[in-house]
Regions:
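Sequence/fold signature of self-assembling virion shell proteins
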Residues: 6, 49, 90-209
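Long, contiguous amphipathic alpha-helices that act as assembly "spine/axial" helices in icosahedral shell
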Residues: 1-42, 47, 66-81, 166, ...
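Extended, solvent-exposed, turn-rich assembly/linker loops in the middle of proteins
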Residues: 39-108
Length: 209
């Protein structure tokens, strides 16, 4: 294996790690903020600290969606790690696998797939940096942490128009005598006005500072 092949493998690892630690968190944060801030989205604000209150709040969200005739099949329940822990404490179940290990994970709740979202990505608004001095995003004061969100996929349209990773050799890189990695991504998240009731957002009652 020559140096270029070895370098190619290294850049492959770099791209995967960059997407996992930089691209995906920013995409998640942007999309959840776009859904939470869309006009007409149902929801409420409250601090959930018990399993009973959490289960009741999620059940109230499903009732609101039922009243708005949102399709029952296909709903997804996105939750913060804290809320996921409360759900696990409020649901009675025990699954034994072939190794006799006990699994208390909750993958489905009332036919909704449960997906845990790190709290840093789960806010009602974010500020994107322009890349000139800082990269990524920040959570602005006045926004709210999201406890959970119920989403029907028909209510949203995530779009990735252009995504391309590029590698520049030292002979091409004009910034330094070094290899350079660049990722260009053009994307957006659209909430359909006639399907907006397919989103329910439950936020904390105290704003971020």
């Amino acid at each position: 294996m020559d140096n270029e092949e070895t370098l190619g493998m290294a850049f492959g690892t770099l791209v995967g790690e960059f997407m996992r630690t930089k691209e995906v968190p920013e995409l998640d944060a942007y999309r959840f903020a776009a859904m939470a801030s869309a006009t007409g989205v149902d929801g409420t604000s409250a601090d959930l600290s018990t399993a009973a209150a959490t289960i009741a709040a999620i059940d109230a969200a499903t009732v609101a969606m039922d009243d708005n005739e949102v399709p029952y099949e296909g709903r997804i329940l996105f939750v913060s790690p804290t809320i996921y822990g409360l759900i696990k404490g409020g649901v009675t179940r025990m699954v034994m696998n072939g190794d006799k290990n006990v699994n208390y994970n909750v993958n489905m709740y009332n036919d909704m797939r449960v997906i845990t979202v790190p709290q840093a990505r789960f806010n009602s608004a974010i500020t994107l940096y322009d890349g000139t001095s800082n990269f990524g995003y920040a959570v602005p004061a006045g926004s709210y942490k999201i406890n959970f969100m119920v989403v029907h996929p028909s209510a949203v349209l995530p779009v990735v128009k252009h995504e391309i990773p590029r590698i520049f050799s030292p002979a091409v890189n004009q910034d330094a005598d070094a290899w350079k990695f660049q990722l260009r991504l053009y994307h957006d998240m659209f909430v359909l006005k006639n399907k907006v009731k397919g989103i329910y957002c439950h936020k904390k009652s105290t704003a971020n500072v």
